[in-house]
Amino acid sequence: LCEGDAVSIIEHMSDSMATRAAEQLGDAVDARVRAEVAEAVAIADYATAHEWHSGDPYDVIGTRPVRLGADGTPLLDEFVALELAALKQISIAAATWLIRDILNLRDRHPQLWQQVQDGALPVFRACQLVQEVARWGLDAGQA
């Protein structure tokens, strides 16, 4: 081997390593997006499993319904945020805000929710958008 051949081999190895690393990074990003979407859908499903319906009986002493989201979102069991906080190992306040954002996204902005599910819009960005819209105080029809 002459010096030029060694340099060429090293450059080729570096290029192939960089290509592999770029592919690994792309795969990791895709996996993260899929995981974030799956988590958002799971949170929405978890909230649905804890919905209160208008005919459901409740007592002042027992579990009560609460509305975590804005107008047009369902009433939920008051302990749903506590349970989600335990499952995700986050604070109750963070769980409450997360449920609020996901419910607002799913129930008040279905087209945006679909974009999130398709992976076209990051979950965090969609949550920022629904937080901003919620500040306007619109009812479900206006949102």
Regions found by a protein language model. Name each.
Residues L1-A143:
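Peripheral, non-cofactor segments flanking catalytic/redox cores
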